[in-house]
Amino acid sequence: MTFLLDDEQREFGRTLDRMLGAADIAGAVRAWAVDDTGPGRKVWQRLADLGVFALAVPEEHAGSGFLPVELAVAFVELGRHGVPGPVVETVAAAALLRRLGDPAPSARWLPGIAAGGHLVSYADTYGETDDTGGTDATGGDAGGGRGPYALDAHTADTTFVVAGDRLLRATGHGPVQPSLDPARRLARPAYGGEVLASGPAVRAASRHAVDVAAFLTAAQALGAGRRLLADTVTYVRQRKQFGVAVGSFQAVRHRLADALVALEFAQPLVFGAAVALAAETGADEQRGRGVAAEGAGRAAAVRREVAAAKVAAGEAAYGAARAALQLHGAIGYTDELDLSLWIRKARALRTAWGTPSECRARVLDGQDIFY
């Protein structure tokens, strides 16, 4: 696919790059990992001031509409700079509320999301329901939950859970668990919660939200991979062995070239998924909200596009992380070196919102594996 951003979209990306480059994102990530979200929330507010979160919020709720291409531009930069927090989940929750079309929860949360003042964690049971008579809608238990994990549930302002055909606001969470990325901590939403909506429309909106989450994770991974590659190129130009820069060795060049090719192949898939999401959203709005055969077929095609982008970008970023670690040596995974933050993030993003095997199954077999 040949895809060119317009001047306004490119300038938007450059503006985000400059703003995030001037901020101490690495410091914010390290603070977030020990539950000090203050520096990270300041970054979130600056992102909101530039309109990032408004890109998923309808105009009637102080947003810009749903603009997947601009979201891809933004999330590549968020991944490049390693912005902490549930950025994917917050935007996916906004997409869920927008697609659901229920005015009450939309008015309650969307303006705050657009303004950057409301962090949302989001978990989805992918159509599974509790088999004990519905007493535990989240798949959890009274002791703290055993359903799907929610990223940063302990620091988010709100945690949404889709369980079967119900959308709930969780009342709490279970024990906080570490992950490969110290700034991405996980917890299972607690038993019960406020029911915000129910019915087939919830499942349809949830499918869309999960697609958006996978798509944004792919964009983040692409940005993280590019950062890892750029930092490694800089390093091998500086490090010397036998009196010459190690970057002059053919084996090193080939390793970096492989990483670059993978990232270059992933980029059109990410933006292709953005175009597909934009087209699907426009068609959905033209025919009105609801379940229709044509809409279901279009949505399935979009999910395959998103899955292709997710597996390509996730594997490319992971490959860049492996190359970065190999060429930096043992210093690459030390906590003191910022590179380790991106290495760990790339590994976590690889499996977030769809593992490589799940995404490949969807692309190759057309399997709707999440639902």
Please name every model-derived segment.
Residues 1-79, 116, 136, 211-371:
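Alpha-helical interface subdomain recognition
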Residues 22, 46, 96-99, 109-112:
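Amphipathic alpha-helical regulatory segments at dimerization interfaces
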Residues 23, 77-78, 97, 159-162, ...:
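Alpha-helix C-terminal capping segments
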Residues 55-57, 88-91, 121-123, 166, ...:
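Short beta-strands and strand-loop turn motifs
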Residues 76-77, 86, 98-99, 111-113, ...:
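Short, charge-rich binding segments
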Residues 85-103:
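N-terminal glycine-rich flavin-associated loop
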Residues 104-230, 234:
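FAD-binding core of flavoproteins
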